Every structure is written in C-alpha cells, then in structure tokens.
C-alpha cells in the first residue's frame, strides 16, 4: 500500500499560508518515496515548498544555484554536513553538492525555501538534466 500524505502538525505561522490541513494539500509525486507541495502564495518569487520523504529514501544528488534553507518539521534527514531533526535548519548554497537521506521511522517533512533552482549532479542528474534540455528544445 502506498503511504498517504504526512499528517504532522504544522507551525502556526505556516498554517495560514496552507489554508487547509496538511493531509488535504495537493501533494505531487517527485520520485518514489518523495512528494512535494509548492506553496502557491510564493509562485514566481521564491521556491517555497513542503517536502515529504519516506524513511531511508535518498534525494537525488544535487547542488544549488543559490541559497536553500530547509526547516525540518517532522522526522529527520542527514547529509555530509550533518544530521538534522525536528526544528533544525539546514543551509546549502553553490558550494554544497549533497544527497540528503531521510532517517528514522517516520516521514521526513520539511519546509524548503530556495532563491534559485537546484542543479542535479552525478550520473542520474546528468540523465535527468539532459532529458529536460531535450524537452525544452522540442517544446514539450
């Protein structure tokens, strides 16, 4: 059975932007074991999204074209810079090339804010980036 969206409590300041319980948001699958919800309030300005990552799941290896701040709302994750649990904030920029992995036994729920796009790296990143370039060239 596929796990449903997370049901973690959300900090009060964030609840006003969501407008509904976290379990009722329009979560979009990103890859197996990972979903996201883009906060429409910030569309076109900054990348502000919620990420839900199943325990043990690794995100694709990536770096950053700008600054990323990630607040852990539930669960935990780790990368080469350390371990992050509920309430921790991780920062990353163009000097960081990492592959965060969700830990623990519960979904890792994070609020991620990016002022520029991520850039996938490693072999899988090269394949995905090449496919995205081809789609742009053929207009899809």
Language-model segments: which ranges?
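Positively biased amphipathic helices and basic secretion/translocation or surface-docking motifs
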Residues: 1-23
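Glycine- and acidic-residue-biased ligand/ion/polar-headgroup-sensing regions
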Residues: 54-57, 63-79
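Double-stranded beta-helix
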Residues: 111-140
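Conserved hydrophobic/aromatic beta-strand scaffold that supports enzyme active sites
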Residues: 36-38, 48-52, 69, 89-91, ...
